[in-house]
Amino acid sequence: MDKKDVIEFFDRHAPDWDAEMIRNDAVISTILDNANVRAGARVLDVACGTGVLVPDYLARGVASVTGIDISPEMIRIAAGKFPSDKVSFICGDVEEAALDGDYDCIVVYNAFPHFPQPQRLINRLSGLLAPGGTLTVAHGMSRRAIDGHHSG
């Protein structure tokens, strides 16, 4: 899939995304523990979709969350759900967007397979980390489950 196809796919599915979200709170909690998401942290949520992890970040007392997603519809929905000064959303390609950097935690959750050049993404995100910051790439589903989830 090229980026245009990815945008079209996620724009089409955005209205039902939250209802169809397969969520395992224990797995998410462990992922965020390992990502060192903690009070006072600046978090970059890559391919944030409708902001499904934003409540988890806020519950941990983070200083700020920046969500970025290539899908305008996903960002529109996310922005409508979280009217907080601690949360901001950017519609754009994380590999090209102008980002402030110095993030304590960068999380790529349920999205890494959608990036056609993984090393390019890792290099880009690594450059946005604050000293001692963490980059976490995690997925809550198996490859088979992912394929089934995105087959529509």
Give short role names for the model-derived ranges.
Residues 1-38, 52, 136-152:
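Conserved class I S-adenosyl-L-methionine
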Residues 44, 50-96:
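Class I SAM-dependent methyltransferase SAM/SAH-binding core
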Residues 42, 133-134:
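Short glycine-centered segments of the SAM/dcSAM-binding site in methyltransferase folds
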Residues 120-131:
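A short glycine-rich, Lys/Arg-flanked "PGG" loop and its adjoining helix->strand segment in the class I
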Residues 107:
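A conserved beta-strand element that flanks and buttresses the S-adenosyl-L-methionine
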